[in-house]
Amino acid sequence: MELSPELLRKLETLAKIRLSPEEEALLLQDLKRILDFVDALPRVEEGGAEEALGRLREDEPRPSLPQAEALALAPEAEDGFFRVPPVLE
């Protein structure tokens, strides 16, 4: 997939963000590298995947951050929930 500056501007509009020309250039480079990486994935040898999975730690439940502490870290909270800007108009 070819990533053009026009497509990047369309993505900016969809994401409702504004980037400076410098940020656009950097993001365009990063996205091209990511797409090249994803494009290369089908050509990667699959051997050794089982071995890699064995290295993961076990999932163990642990205490999480109390709700009051989590909400205290948020810019805005209301009635025990995070308050965020509307996504849909």
Curated annotation (Swiss-Prot):
It catalyses: L-glutamyl-tRNA(Gln) + L-glutamine + ATP + H2O = L-glutaminyl-tRNA(Gln) + L-glutamate + ADP + phosphate + H(+); L-aspartyl-tRNA(Asn) + L-glutamine + ATP + H2O = L-asparaginyl-tRNA(Asn) + L-glutamate + ADP + phosphate + 2 H(+). It is an enzyme of class 6 (ligase). The keyword Zinc does not apply. One of its GO terms (molecular function) is asparaginyl-tRNA synthase (glutamine-hydrolyzing) activity. Its EC number is 6.3.5.-. InterPro entries: Asp/Glu-ADT_sf_sub_c, GatC. One of its GO terms (biological process) is translation. The keyword rRNA-binding does not apply. Keywords: ATP-binding, Ligase, Nucleotide-binding, Protein biosynthesis. HAMAP family: GatC. Allows the formation of correctly charged Asn-tRNA(Asn) or Gln-tRNA(Gln) through the transamidation of misacylated Asp-tRNA(Asn) or Glu-tRNA(Gln) in organisms which lack either or both of asparaginyl-tRNA or glutaminyl-tRNA synthetases. The reaction takes place in the presence of glutamine and ATP through an activated phospho-Asp-tRNA(Asn) or phospho-Glu-tRNA(Gln). PANTHER family: GLUTAMYL-TRNA(GLN) AMIDOTRANSFERASE SUBUNIT C, MITOCHONDRIAL. Belongs to the GatC family. Heterotrimer of A, B and C subunits. This is Glutamyl-tRNA(Gln) amidotransferase subunit C. It comes from Thermus thermophilus (strain ATCC 27634 / DSM 579 / HB8). The lineage of its organism: Bacteria, Thermotogati, Deinococcota, Deinococci, Thermales. The gene is gatC.
